[in-house]
């Protein structure tokens, strides 16, 4: 199987989907690997480093001729022209956010494997490290954009406690998963007060136990509680993600209007559509805008801003799956590995993820019923 590592076109995206170390694992297993020129530069990996591990350096167009194209994020619209029948595209594709790309993949007969929908032992194991990074970084961005020169309230989120008692900021975090706890931990480290809004009762108990000795309040998620708590936020971070599907707009414009002027609003799951009515995708180089008097931060690829850390994390997670696909062939790998099967969103043009099908009102096929 010919495997290609392509350079990301998404603005500000410095990650690469495969490290030189993982290229060596593939070539040692007898697979041919091509790497687009400068694909790894943003993460600190030179072309020479890939060549030393057995890869051939190629152009962007040549990379897309591969049987298996390994990416970090969804293909750019300029790359749709390279799709070919039975080609496998691997990455954090977040296909629920774009019907256009899904229809193009269906038209050509592409197979799309989305790392964010791979579930193993009840957990999104490939997404979790990226969620952790996005959560931590969101807390930091909330502090940064709270400053006056960025349009924020002009507050220092840590407060001041040297001979005076100026309280820190309040972070309201919507959702209680991996991204949420990582955001909360950074916020607590900044001496901020944290409120977590969570739906699941078992998770609420877990969070209450986890933060029993910390300045954290855990609140049951209801529309009424959300509307009440968001008014307290100096920084509001939404972490709600439904794997494979587009989430509902749970944070309404009226709720945003009720927030403090100059407060900061961040949606970590904006790459899947987000849960905030007033949010739209932004970029790492132009990350914020003001609406309803609130600073909106809608960067969909936050881990791409710290590519050295993020690339190492994602590469550790994806290589075993990629090797299994290459060694066994996709169909046998799917049959043998239930977790891998949950990542197949489109198989040869057929939608095989129920959440994705529902998001775009498309026909759904069970993956094990369509593989040969």
UniProtKB/Swiss-Prot annotation:
| GO BP | L-alanine catabolic process
Pathway membership, UniProt: Amino-acid degradation; L-alanine degradation via dehydrogenase pathway; NH(3) and pyruvate from L-alanine: step 1/1
Q: For binding NAD(+), which residues are annotated in this chain's numbering?
A: 170-200
Q: Where is the active site?
A: 94
Q: What is its EC number?
A: 1.4.1.1
Gene Ontology CC annotations of this record: plasma membrane
Q: In terms of domain of life, where is this protein from? A: Bacteria
Q: Which family does it belong to?
A: Belongs to the AlaDH/PNT family.
Function per UniProt: May play a role in cell wall synthesis as L-alanine is an important constituent of the peptidoglycan layer.
What protein is this chain from? Alanine dehydrogenase 1
Gene this chain is encoded by: ald1
